[in-house]
Amino acid sequence: VFVWVGTIIASLYFQSWLPLLFIVLPNFYGKTLVTIFGATQHAGLKEDVKDHRHSTRSVLLNPVFSFLYWQMEYHIEHHMFPTVPSYNLPKLHEMIKDQMPPIRKGLYGAYKEIIPALIKQSKDPHYKIPLAIPA
């Protein structure tokens, strides 16, 4: 709290938004982005299964969102190979994409699948999104 108050005072003193933009506001817009992106990773999918392709989703983001999210949109790949650095996840995806379910295109593509599934799960808690996984 003291840091935020000090930042607000510094912004008023220097008549600049920069201290707020770099210290206080990232907490708000950063958490919002993490929530929006994070929900795409597992919502509506199976739980407690050993094959991460059934419990995790990869979503192709635009370059800005991908950078902000450390390329963690390749989430199946991250779960299957957790020691691969985030900057190598796109390369890993290219190597194994023929063994993966289809990647969702953007947040819209992910939420188009997630929202109906969550509605179905509110009525049937055992419902899980069926995935087409290559053999």
What kind of feature is each model-predicted range?
Residues 1-62, 66, 126-135:
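Hydrophobic transmembrane alpha-helical segments that form the core helix bundle
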Residues 31, 84-87:
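Residue-level signal for short amphipathic helical patches enriched in basic/charged
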Residues 37-44, 68-84:
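Histidine-centered catalytic micro-motifs
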Residues 55-60, 78-82, 100-107:
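Short, exposed beta-strand "edge-strand" segments with a Pro/Gly-rich flavor and a Y/T-containing core
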